[in-house]
C-alpha cells in the first residue's frame, strides 16, 4: 500500500487512528512494528518511527522497555456521538470494548428550550435518559443526557427503563419505528464542570471539561435524538474525514 499525499507519517497516523476509534484496534492490542509499517506503507523506518512517536505523544499508544508498542485508549480517547452511532449501526454495539454504561435516570421530563426546539415538541414533555460511561478500569469517561420525543415512550417503552438498551437506542428506535439515524450533528466547547457534572465524572467542580451537544437525524433530516455530554480533560477527540 502506497501513500500519495504528504506528509506520509500523518497519513499513516490517520489510518491507525481510524482503526483505534472504530475498535478494530483495541486497548492493549499490538501496533504494527516500525519494520511492518515501513513495508506496508512504503515509507522509511525513520518515518515509521515518527508514526509511533506521534501516537504516543497523543496518548493513543504506549511502549514499555523491551516490549512492543500497544494501543492505549482507556484514559485518553474521547469517542464522539458520530463514533458511537457508526459503531451501533455497523456492529450493533454502541460502546467500545471494555466500556460499560450505567443508566442513572429514565423518565418523562420537561426539556430545556433548546432541546424542545430541536425535537419540535409542543407537549412540554420528552423522554430524558441520563447515563455515565465507564472504562474497563471503572473510571468515568463521560456523562450524558439524551432526549427523545414523548411519543417514543409508547413505541419504545425501553426508553423509560433504567437499564441499558442492547445495541443502543438508535437501533431500538429503528426496530420499533423504521426510522434510522443516518447522521449526527455535533457542537463542542470547553467548559467548567458544574457540581453535578463534577460528581458524575469524579473531578473537582470548576475543572475543565469538554461539553458536547449532538443531534441524531433520519434520512428525511428529522430529529430522532438530542443529547448533551461532558467528558473530563485529558482525553483526545479523533477526527476522521
Curated annotation (Swiss-Prot):
Transmembrane in keyword set: no
> Which residue windows are coiled coil?
none
Q: Which residues bind DNA?
A: 34-53
Q: Sorted alphabetically, which keywords does the UniProt record give? A: DNA-binding, Plasmid, Repressor, Transcription, Transcription regulation
**Any Pfam family:** GntR
Statement: the UniProt record of this protein carries the keyword Ribosomal protein: no
A Gene Ontology annotation in the biological process aspect, one of them, is: negative regulation of DNA-templated transcription
Ranges where the HTH gntR-type domain occurs = 6-74
What one GO molecular function would you report for this record? DNA-binding transcription factor activity
* UniProt cross-references to SMART domains, sorted A to Z: HTH_GNTR (SM00345), UTRA (SM00866)
Q: What does this protein do?
A: Controls plasmid transfer and prevents the lethal effects of the tra/kilA gene. Repressor for the transcription of certain pIJ101 promoters, including those the from kilA and kilB loci.
Q: Protein name, please? A: Protein KorA
What is the organism of origin for this protein? Streptomyces lividans
Amino acid at each position: 500500500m502506497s501513500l500519495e499525499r504528504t506528509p506520509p507519517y500523518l497519513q499513516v497516523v490517520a489510518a491507525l487512528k481510524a482503526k483505534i476509534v472504530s475498535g478494530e484496534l483495541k486497548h492493549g492490542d499490538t501496533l504494527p512494528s516500525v519494520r511492518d509499517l515501513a513495508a506496508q506503507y512504503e515509507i522509511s523506518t525513520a518515518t515509521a518511527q515518527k508514526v509511533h512517536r506521534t501516537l504516543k505523544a497523543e496518548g493513543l499508544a504506549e511502549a514499555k522497555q523491551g516490549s512492543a508498542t500497544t494501543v492505549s485508549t482507556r484514559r485518553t480517547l474521547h469517542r464522539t456521538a458520530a463514533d458511537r452511532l457508526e459503531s451501533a449501526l455497523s456492529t450493533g454495539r454502541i460502546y467500545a470494548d471494555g466500556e460499560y454504561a450505567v443508566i442513572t435516570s429514565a423518565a418523562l421530563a420537561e426539556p430545556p428550550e433548546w432541546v424542545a426546539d430541536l425535537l419540535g415538541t409542543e407537549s412540554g414533555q420528552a423522554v430524558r435518559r441520563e447515563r455515565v460511561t465507564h472504562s474497563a478500569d471503572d473510571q468515568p469517561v463521560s456523562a450524558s443526557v439524551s432526549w427523545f420525543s414523548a411519543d417514543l415512550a409508547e413505541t419504545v417503552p425501553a426508553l423509560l427503563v433504567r437499564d441499558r438498551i442492547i445495541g443502543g437506542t438508535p437501533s431500538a428506535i429503528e426496530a420499533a419505528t423504521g426510522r434510522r439515524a443516518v447522521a449526527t450533528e455535533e457542537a463542542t466547547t470547553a467548559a467548567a464542570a458544574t457540581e453535578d457534572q463534577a460528581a458524575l465524572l469524579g473531578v473537582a467542580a470548576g475543572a475543565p471539561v469538554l461539553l458536547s451537544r449532538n443531534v441524531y437525524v433520519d434520512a428525511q433530516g428529522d430529529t430522532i435524538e438530542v443529547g448533551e455530554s461532558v467528558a473530563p480533560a485529558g482525553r483526545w477527540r479523533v477526527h476522521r474525514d
